[in-house]
Amino acid sequence: MWTLTCQQFIALILLGTLVPSESFLCKHCFRKNLEKVHESFRDILSPPIFGVNPQPLIEVQQPKVTPKPESSQVIHVHQPQVILKPIYYPKVDTISTKNQIGIHGPYSQYPSLLPSANLLGIPNQQLINAQDVLSDKDQKQTQVQNNNLHIRFGVSALREGRNNPSLETISRDKVDKISPALQLQLLRYADSQSQSQTQSQSASQSESNASSQFQAQEQSNRLLENPPVSESQSQSESQSQSESQKQSQSQSQRQQQIQTQLQILRQLQQKSNEQSAAQSASQIQSQRQSDSQSNLQLQEQSQSQSEQGKPIQSQIQILQGLQQKELDDKSASQSQSESKTRQEQQKQLNLQQLEELSSSLSQSRLGLGQQIQSQLQKNQLDKQFASQFQSQSKSQLEQQMQLQLQSLRQLQQKQLDEQSASQSQPQSQVAQQIQSHLQLLRLLQSRLKTQSALKSDLEQQILLQLKKLTEVQQKQLAEQPTLRPSSKSQSPGQLEQQILLQLQNLLQFQQNQLKSDTQTQSQLQESKSNSLSQSQSQSQEQLQLQRDQNLRQLEQIKLEMQNIRELLQKGKSELQTQSDSQRRIHELYQNILQLNKEKLSYQLKQLKLKELEDQKKSQAEISKGSNPSNLFIIGQLPSEGKPAPGNQGPSIEPKLVPQPGSLDKLPSGGGLIGKPASTGLYILSPDFNDLSDYRDQFRLQQELKKHQNILSLLQRRQNDIKKQQNAQLLLGQQQKEQQAQESINKQQSSSAGSSSQTKLQQDIQSTGAQGSQQGLQAGSTGLQTSSLQGTESSASQSAALQRLKEQEQLRIQTENDQKTSSSSSHSNSQNSQSSSSQSSQASQSEAQRQEAGNRNTLLLDQSSSKTQSESKSESSSQSSSHSSSQSTSNSSSNVQSKLQGESQALLNNLSG
């Protein structure tokens, strides 16, 4: 998980939630947003320290996000976030001289005490040490006040306030220049200082007068009661003089410090503006005069006090000690209040940080939900594209197959036309031969009048045979035009069956002819030799032409078959890619479901833990509720049912909050936090747990809607697949029925023509040895290819081999029979050879067709075995295609069933 790539990805996600979507690609806005992010991180790491009276916190105005109309018409408007920082306006009042002077005016520390104090037996050294300690405290307080004077009149250049947003540091270039506002503030400060000094002088004069009167009265009383003691008076006078000297020294030090500060300010004023030099000089002179007057007055007052205020020194010192204690208590209480306010501010900042973190987490969750939505939409689009691609590929394959079938049919028509043209020529030759035969018969009839009965029978038989031949030829001529339109719908196997039937009829006719013409063969030997020479010369030329044509056609058929195979391979590869894509989609969907399950379980665990923690906290708070000193109010209660102005949220509940001592005891909710009040023990704060629960429920509803949409799409896809499967099953049943009918017809034809094939093979082997060799090669290749298809093809191959062996044995027997019967069969040889030439030509054309059929549909034999193997191979290929389609459909159905089961389980979990 924590590799570099993962860390970068997580950082991008977190930054993307903080940056708005519009300005993500704009460089200007991106820089501004990054700077804002840096500032927020700095504030989190080093929070600012506010003063005693904190102003309202920073308010951030969210930018107005305009919707994107189109990518071509986007006009980017720069609307940065406006951050309203609080501006602290310092009070331009007189300097509070409570810490310097006290509540009832200035006070001075005298070294001597009353004789009544000495009567108690306190040594003078201890009193002097106590006075020194008090004077040290005063000096420290004055130093602190002198250092903090710039806070009172807003001179921000003298303080380094990094964490305070209200204090702005002035650059070094701008130090020499003083604004007119600062000049006015300096003048006001000088006036206020002079006024405060005059007030302090008047107060000190009044006190000195009162003390002098009181001392005079006491002295008069003492003189009346006791005679004066010269030594004690001289000692007290010396002590008072030393104390007055010390006081004058401290006052001179203070005056020197004030003068140094004023000199610095005057130097700044002189550097600021040359125009205001005269005015500032006059003001400085007036201030100097006022300072000198105040110093003189203070000296006079000190002298008068040293002369007059001796008897009240002890009381004043006691009052000073009490005042200092009170001041110390006040300062301690102020420091405590300041620490409390700082702690409250830190708590506020921490709560704000928690709120920001919760908002960022919610935004990140929303971003993740949007990413999951986009991924699901992409998956749906991919599925739609895949289905469209499947339909398009199927339609393209069907179109290509139809075009190739049309081209094959056209080639078959051309072959039939050429065969009819080639057959028309031997038919004319046959007619001429028949005429010659008739002439010979007439001559024989004239010679053999004695044997009229036998000759009449023979003539009748020959005439019947000739009539049958003519009828057969007429039938062939009549059947050829009828075959042309039907050839488009008939397969090459059916055409071969029809041709085999015709050849069987011819062979039967020839057998009858041979039986009846054994007697007439001796008479027709001469005509036979002549007709043989002519027919052989003509048949050789025709055979060569037909062989050339057949070779060309075979090459064309080979090319077309290669194209068909390539298309089939492409279709298989496309099906494989589609199945792979479906598997990937299924795996992605399963991963998404697992993630959703884990999220749901994690959220349930968190909710349970939160409930337990809330219960524990509520119990602890109820147990602590008896001590009201541990609790205080944060925020303000709404009056008369009105909600609090700053609170936001769907539900507001009162909660008990402990005293702010540690951040670990803070509640989970947040709200507006202000000063502690003593009117009650409850606060108003929105419960963020309820908000998170509401958001989780909303997200769960969205996820349920997504799953329902996916299920509806999958059900539609399943219905389409079922329709396709039903159509394929109907086509397969129709093809099986056609194949069954063809096999029945072929079996009948093979049983009827098994007797006639023996003599056909003699003529075929004598004239077409090359065709038989090619057929055997094609049969061997067909056996090799069909051996992979199953047990049915192996059985057909063994049967075909047995038939070939039987045919070879029959051929050897017929050759022996022909050698023995050649001497006695010369009479009717012309008719037999003419029919044999026709049969040989037909057999050659058949052999060439069968070779093409062997390469197209893997036929093994020249007889019905080839057609049967074709039908079986077609059925096996169809069954394999059906099985592949069924396997794909089964896999798709399995995927759909799994998806439905998982979706139902999710629904049950959510409902539970």
Curated annotation (Swiss-Prot):
Keywords: Behavior, Secreted, Signal. Detected in the male accessory glands (at protein level). Produced in the accessory glands and secreted into seminal fluid. Proteolytically cleaved by the seminal metalloprotease Semp1. Cleavage appears to take place in the mated female. Changing residue 844 to R: In strain: WSII16. Changing residue 335 to P: In strain: SENGWA30. Responsible for physiological and behavioral changes in mated female flies. Associates with sperm and localizes to specific regions of the female reproductive tract, including the sperm storage organs. It accelerates sperm accumulation into storage but does not mediate the entry of the first sperm into storage. Once sperm storage has initiated it seems to act as a guidance factor helping subsequent sperm move into storage, a corral concentrating sperm around the SSO entrances and/or a trigger for responses within the female that accelerate storage of sperm. This is Accessory gland protein Acp36DE. It comes from Drosophila melanogaster (Fruit fly).
